[in-house]
UniProtKB/Swiss-Prot annotation:
Organism: Salinispora tropica (strain ATCC BAA-916 / DSM 44818 / JCM 13857 / NBRC 105044 / CNB-440)
SUPFAM superfamilies attached to this UniProt entry: Thioredoxin-like (SSF52833)
UniProt-annotated stretches for the region Disordered: 626-652
PANTHER family: NA(+)_H(+) ANTIPORTER NHAA (PTHR30341:SF0), SODIUM ION/PROTON ANTIPORTER NHAA-RELATED (PTHR30341)
Domain Thioredoxin intervals: 429-623
Pfam families xrefs: Na_H_antiport_1, Thioredoxin_4
Protein name (record): Na(+)/H(+) antiporter NhaA 3
InterPro entries referenced in this protein's UniProt entry, alphabetically: Na/H_antiporter_dom_sf (IPR023171), NhaA (IPR004670), Thioredoxin-like_fold (IPR012336), Thioredoxin-like_sf (IPR036249), Thioredoxin_domain (IPR013766)
Family: In the N-terminal section; belongs to the NhaA Na(+)/H(+) (TC 2.A.33) antiporter family.
A single BP term in Gene Ontology: regulation of pH
Membrane topology, from the record: Multi-pass membrane protein
Length: 652
């Protein structure tokens, strides 16, 4: 059941209830390039500030702030509260994202963790070896921990700026490698650089973490309770001499992620209807609790803390720590300093070498049981961008080194950040010069991704728009009354005009608990499909989402010149209900609970459904399709603007 999309024609109109929710500011805040720019700006401000007025810089960050409760108090300077207090929330966000990948992403197949894990370890050992080669036998050898870490936030931002446009696999690989680094770094901070170690306080912290696991296993979902336990763990770890940022990472890894269940969403909708009929404080609390319980704790916490961590906390950290007085004396000393040279070569050479060598050896030694999720160019790119240690390297440097050695390490970290960024740009620039098929293999590799769509597309059964056979298939579970489906519709249409080798599949998922006319509209579309006009009816229904009553449906059928008696009979007998129920069952199998939900070549699409995001997912799928024997041909993705094309569209 296929229909062709008119070529050479763009839809500029929006459905009645559709509106563009994106603004330039919102788009900026939802990109990693935005946070990377803010971070770099903060670093520049710190360098300018300390070189113009060092006394005011140091007096601010050295100011002591205390928290007192009776006779008990905690006193630290402002730099500590940023480095070990606010940065706990940054590590919380990192832990949340890794846990989400464990629960819903590629790492839910645990075997896929092995190679990034070993690559991360390789990316730690090689830099340490290079740093120690420069500093062996010197007091500065104690700073070997400085070269271990990757600044996850800045590395991801630089990858978004310098890397290929369609880099989800690349991003996930980098994230896993970087988090392995962060976990090991935290262990090293605890063991190698403790301040006034207290085993008893560490034992108390371990007990608190165990309590968190117990109450989570018991199904307790009271957020303030977890917050109090997190604060208690932070205080205990701080008293133990270990950097308390570890608490954020551990709590993030403890916070599970899941797709909202449709039953939970329906229950929340039922509570809202009760509140609508009889508003009261008790029902208001019930509605809030129902809405919160439908979403995973991981999603809720990421939504709260990710913007703060990216746009406030990490830039504040850079502002507090990057400041170093750069003068001729320091530069002359750094040019020959084993600390500076050790840090520079460890990050620019050691990081990529360790990651690349480990990624090459693991598949060979495991007889391809553990394969890289990306290609060789992407592995090299991940290696080079992992050489951006920046904020995390500065964090360790403040623990490991002091005095002139600390300033020399900061110079090395800053120069290494620039060097790693330049080599990353060069790697992806060279990869971009490869022929398309070779470039796809170099960036994506040959490993298969996880398929999320449980019921495969059947062109004889499904409603297909575009070519019957295509290298890329976009499946949408949608609801004709859903306003968000209306917002997605213009993007889908533009996608099909831009990429003529894509086939688009509509599957019904009427959310009858919130959209009273969605089921009837879906059945009307099936009634039109019986007469060869599914897509014409589909377009009318989405264009008039506020007009889906029975009389409206009959008016649309008349406008399409359908046999009205046959159309009425189809609706009266509810002949399309069984077909719609099959789509709903298929949605349940794929853990689809809301609309619109998109799948691109079987992979669930996470994120916005605007034309930019969908185009990125489609182009990534095209690149992967080229690696398969049946997808080796180069598709004509883009139609030429202004070409003569028919104005009318065949039916189903």
């Amino acid at each position: 059941m296929t229909g062709e999309i008119p070529r050479g024609r763009r839809w500029s109109a929006r459905t009645t209830r559709a509106s563009r929710l994106n603004s330039p500011l919102r788009a900026f805040l939802h990109t990693e390039t935005g946070s990377a720019r803010v971070l770099l700006a903060a670093a520049v401000v710190a360098l300018a500030w300390v070189n113009l007025d060092e006394s005011s810089y140091e007096s601010l960050w050295g100011a002591v702030f205390s928290v007192r409760l009776g006779s008990w108090q905690v006193s630290h300077d402002l730099r500590f509260w940023v480095n070990s207090g606010l940065m706990t929330f940054f590590f919380l966000v990192i832990g949340l994202e890794v846990r989400r990948d464990f629960d819903l992403g590629e790492l839910r197949e645990r075997r896929r963790l092995m190679l990034p894990l070993l690559a991360g370890i390789g990316g730690i050992l090689a830099p340490i070896a290079i740093y120690l080669a420069f500093n062996a036998g010197k007091p500065t050898a104690v700073g070997w921990g400085v070269v271990m870490a990757t600044d996850t936030a800045l590395a991801l931002g630089m990858l978004a700026v310098l890397g290929p446009r369609f880099s989800d696999r690349l991003r996930n690989f980098l994230l896993t490698v970087a988090v392995v680094d962060d976990l090991i770094v935290i262990v090293v901070l605890a063991i190698a650089y403790p301040e006034h170690p207290s085993p008893m306080a560490l034992f108390v912290a371990a007990g608190i973490f165990a309590l968190v696991l117990l109450i989570r296993a018991a199904g307790v979902r009271w957020g303030p309770g977890y917050l109090l336990l997190g604060v208690a763990a932070w205080l205990a770890v701080s008293e133990s001499g270990v950097d308390p940022v570890v608490v954020g990472l551990v709590m993030g890894l403890f916070t599970y992620a899941y797709v909202p269940a449709r039953t939970e969403l329906q229950r929340a909708a039922d509570r809202f209807r009760l509140f609508r009929e009889q508003p009261s404080p008790q029902l208001a609390r019930s509605v809030r609790a129902g809405l919160a319980s439908a979403l995973s704790p991981n999603d809720r916490l990421q939504h709260i803390y990710h913007p703060w961590a990216s746009y406030l906390i990490v830039p504040l950290f850079a502002l507090a720590n990057v400041g170093v007085v750069v003068d001729r004396e320091l530069l002359a000393r750094a040019a020959t300093s084993p600390v500076t040279l050790g840090v520079l070569f460890a990050y620019v050479v050691g990081k990529p070498a360790g990651i690349v060598i480990a990624s090459m050896l693991v598949p060979r030694l495991s007889h391809n049981q553990f394969r890289a999720p990306v290609g060789w160019a992407a592995i090299i790119g991940v290696g080079t961008v992992s050489g951006i240690g920046f904020t995390i390297a500065l964090l360790i440097a403040t623990h490991a080194l002091h005095g002139p050695a600390l300033d020399e390490a900061k110079v090395g970290i800053l120069v290494a950040t620039v060097g790693a960024s330049l080599t990353t740009w060069l790697v992806f620039r060279l990869a971009a010069r490869l022929a398309p098929a070779r470039r796809a293999r170099a960036l994506l590799g040959a490993s298969e991704g996880i398929i999320d769509l449980m019921v495969p597309v059947d062109p004889d059964r499904d409603h297909v728009r575009g070519p019957r056979e295509a290298p890329v298939t976009v499946v949408e579970y949608a609801d004709f009354e859903c306003p968000y489906c209306g917002q997605a519709e213009p993007a889908v249409r533009e996608l099909l005009v831009d990429y003529t080798s894509v086939r688009y599949v509509w599957r019904h998922l009427p959310l009858t608990d919130v959209h009273p006319y969605a089921q009837m509209a879906a059945e009307a579309a099936e009634a039109a499909a019986e007469q060869g006009a599914f897509w014409e009816m589909h377009d009318l229904l989405l264009a008039h989402q506020d007009e889906l009553r029975p009389a409206d449906l009959l008016r649309y059928a008349e406008r399409l010149d359908l046999d009205l008696d046959r159309f009425r009979e189809h609706l009266a007998d509810r002949r399309g209900a069984g077909r719609i129920a099959q789509d709903v069952d298929a949605a349940d199998l794929s853990s689809v609970s809301g609309t619109p939900t998109f799948f691109v070549n079987g992979r669930r699409h996470h994120g916005p459904y605007n034309i930019e995001a969908l185009s990125a997912a489609v182009m990534s799928a095209f690149a992967s399709a080229r690696l398969r024997p049946e997808g080796g041909r180069e598709p004509d993705h883009r139609s030429e603007a202004g070409s003569e094309q028919p104005d009318e569209e065949p039916g189903t």
